[in-house]
Every structure is written in structure tokens, then in C-alpha cells.
Amino acid sequence: MRSFSSFHISPMKCKPALRVHPLCDKLQMEMDRWCVDFASPESSDEEMRSFIAQKLPFLSCMLFPTALNSRIPWLIKFVCWFTLFDSLVDDVKSLGANARDASAFVGKYLETIHGAKGAMAPVGGSLLSCFASLWQHFREDMPPRQYSRLVRHVLGLFQQSASQSRLRQEGAVLTASEFVAGKRMFSSGATLVLLMEYGLGVELDEEVLEQPAIRDIATTAIDHLICVNDILSFRVEYLSGDFSNLLSSICMSQGVGLQEAADQTLELMEDCNRRFVELHDLITRSSYFSTAVEGYIDGLGYMMSGNLEWSWLTARYHGVDWVAPNLKMRQGVMYLEEPPRFEPTMPLEAYISSSDSC
């Protein structure tokens, strides 16, 4: 079977400035200890070391650099919880390839959200117990309308996690637009945007949230997160046998090679950059612009730049010995040194172009 050998990533830029939360250094060690406490029952020692090496508290401090000091620890905990949850439901050797088991796993979290009898009871140091604690905090601390939006987003997130396993099992091929639209609606991006708003200590009026430019700038930020994550996580997902990725969708649906798929994804990312700047300028000149709106749209930009920086640095995508390219201009070559020994649901030949070099 023919396999990819490498693909080049042209310069990845992000217009919004990179910022880090001022409490980052203080919180990082504390949050690492917290990660060990809640993740250990679910993980082997090796998995635990890998989990800590992902620098998730650092990611959170770049995603939410302007969050209130009292709220940033809860945002860090949510990001850490979701990352471990996501790893479990995307594991193609387990839940990620078994729709029935994935649905049952997600069902336990749905019970917690809906407040089923006994659902909030702690279960040791488990992932579910961690989520129950987080959810109780958000339920008690968020304004009612903001909490209702959180419920909708997280229910969609769980729905997407379960349906992803079904799509893998069926060998479904999505176009790039279908893939992005699905992730945009149900991925973690929409939840993170809402948590960013909560972290600022504001609740935007529904009238403001429904403004076309506000909706568009949030969508643009989420699309940027999708493009960045999928291009920089492709290598580790490919080597694990996971083809639920934007690059894979482009290859399979269009019959193009991996380099072309990477280039298309980078072009989408650049479109997001340009669109964000245009929308930011438009909103600052609007009649509904306010200090709260300014914090919100700036926060979206910080999420974009923070996610790009972390995605280049994290061991989650590149391994613990990874040395990232130059800080000012992220670019490089992703090597696939060890071709996977498996038969994917959708044969590799179906989407490897003859133009690919090996």
C-alpha cells in the first residue's frame, strides 16, 4: 500500500496579537497537579506523562488571556477535561470506531447535564466526576441565559462526538464544506467562544449576539481553529488510523493529493484571517459597539492566535521531543516516518493522487 511521506506547511500567520494570561506561570504547576488527580484513574503512567506534556494549562492561558482571575482556573479545567474526553471518544481502537459504545459513553454525560437522579454524585477521581464538578460550577455561576446557551453547545458537542464514531464505522466521505459545517456547529469551538465570553465576566445581549457581523466573526474564529488544528494534528491522527480530519476529507472527496489538501486548508485559514480583520473593523464602527463587545471580539482574536501558537508547540500533535519552527513565522515539513500497518475503512488508494511524491 502506498503511503504519504511528508507534506509542506507554508507560513501560518495570525493577525490578532498573541497574549498570555498574567497568572499563567502561577497556575500552570497547580493545574498540572489537578490534571494528575483527575486523569490518573483513566490513564496509564505513560499516558499521564503524555497528557501533562500537552501543556493544556498554557493553551488555556493563551485562549483566554483576558479572563477574570477568578474564572481562568475553571476555564483551564474545562479545556483539560475536554481534551482527555476527546482523546477517549476519538480513539480509533476503541470508542472512536464503535458507535454503540461511544453513544453509551456520551450518555453518561448527558445524564449529568440533564440532572438525572444521582448523576451529580462524585465517582472517585474519574473523568465523569470531573465533568460533574465543572458543570455544577457553571450551572451555579453563569447567568441563566448564558447557561442555557452553554447547554445547547455542549449537547451539540456530545452529539458530534457520538456521530463521529458512526461516520468512521460507516466509512462516510464528507466534502470539505460539509466537514467544516459539522464541526462549526458541534465542535468544541462554539463552546470555547461562549466560555471566553463567560471568562470576561460579561453576557452579551441576544440582540447583539444576533447581529450578522457578530455571528460571522465568531464563525470565522471557529473556522480558523478547525483549520489550524486539523492541519497540525493530521500527522498523529493519520499514524493512528484516524481519517476524520479536514485534510483527509479534501483528499477523499476531491481525489487530490495530500499537499494540495494542506494548501487548500492553509488558504481557508488565510481567508479566516482576512475576514476577521474586516469584521473586527466593521464592528468597531457599528451602533452596537461597546466595551463588552470590544472585549468579546478581541477575545476571539486571542483565541485564534493562542490556538495557533499552542498547536505548533504541543506534544499532543508532535511528540515530546518536538522543536517548533521559528516563532515569528510558523512553517515546516510534517514527516510521516512510519507508515501505518492497518487497513482503513476507506482505502488509502481512494484518495492518494498520483502527483504525490513518496
UniProtKB/Swiss-Prot annotation:
Gene Ontology MF term list: terpene synthase activity
Coiled-coil parts of chain: none
InterPro entries with a match to the protein in the record: Isoprenoid_synthase_dom_sf, Terpene_cyclase-like_2
Pfam family of the protein (one): Terpene_syn_C_2
Alphabetical list of SUPFAM superfamilies matching this protein: Terpenoid synthases (SSF48576)
Chain segments annotated as transmembrane: none
Record GO biological process: isoprenoid biosynthetic process
Domain of life: Eukaryota
Function of the molecule: No terpene synthase activity detected in vitro.
Family: Belongs to the terpene synthase family.
Misc. remarks from the entry: Selaginella moellendorffii contains two distinct types of functional terpene synthases (TPS) genes, the typical seed plants TPS genes (SmTPSs) and a microbial type TPS genes (SmMTPSLs).
Record-given protein name: Microbial Terpene synthase-like protein 13
Source species: Selaginella moellendorffii (Spikemoss)
